[in-house]
Amino acid sequence: MKMKLLGGLLAGATLIAGLAKAEETISAVHAFPETLIYTKSFLSFVDKVNEAGKGVVQIDVRGGPEAIGMFQQPDAVRDGIVDMVYTPGSFYAAALPEKDALVASNLTAVETRQNGGIALIDEIHQQKMGLKYLGWFDSGVCYNLWTRNEPKFDANGNLEVEGLKLRGNNVYNAFFTNYLGAQVIDLPTGEVYSALQRGVVDATGWTQIGLIDLKWNEFLNYRIEPCFFSTDLGVVVNNDKWNSLSEEARKIVQDVAVQHEKDSVMALRAKRDEDFAALGAAGMKVVSLEGDAKANYLAAAREKTWERMKTVMGEQPGGTGNYDRLIELFYDLNAAK
């Protein structure tokens, strides 16, 4: 009787150990604070994976920039310090200039998943950085220029930037400096509020949503149309970690990512409309470029970014071999007309 009881206990312990071992864990960090809408979107994705992956795979979020600095996160996932990162591709642009195809895109993840664009970006990530590009989240949202003071225009309707203390970053500096001729002040997102408060900057590029989350609307009074660019927020996974997961775990995570690409497009467009309404009600004014000035503004945003991409690609192994294909997959010239 004792032997049977012991045997049963051992069998039960083995079963429990097997079940515990079967549930794999992916550690993750995100680039922005939890209060920002984009981070909330990523955490929603995590919740979906953890629900679908019960007993198989779970994502363990370790935090945001307070855990690993936002600009150090791409190296951290490449080096295996963390398994997964949600971050703009622009934060590792020096290693992967092809991310500019997403920045200059007028398509969303839905179209580029279907046409092979994301598959190509994934392939390039694996080749250049040893990373699995899991998905392009929160696409379909573009950028505006936001200013404290009323914008000025020249006789031809072009935006005048002389005297503007414009905050810049890696996403839009090629456009701001090479076309607008602006002198930019590079600042990470977390430092912009205090810079606006102290008058260090009085204008910034930012996406159509999130201004209220960051409380920058306390200082910014004008939105300049048209919007330009696209968000390039994506999830990357250390390739060794990805390949070590079971086939079932990989399928769960990838399937949820593809669905979240679709869901986030609609969710963030609704959030954009909500934010615009709230900003307008609080007194935010909208000014717009028109005619040739508008067309030239949009063309420059696109072409200066492509120019930057091609230049940096040409300096790296593999050169510009994927350049034309990236533009073909991530930009619809007919839609731009």
Residue positions per predicted region:
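A gly/proline- and charged-residue-enriched helix-loop-helix capping module
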Residues: T108-K128
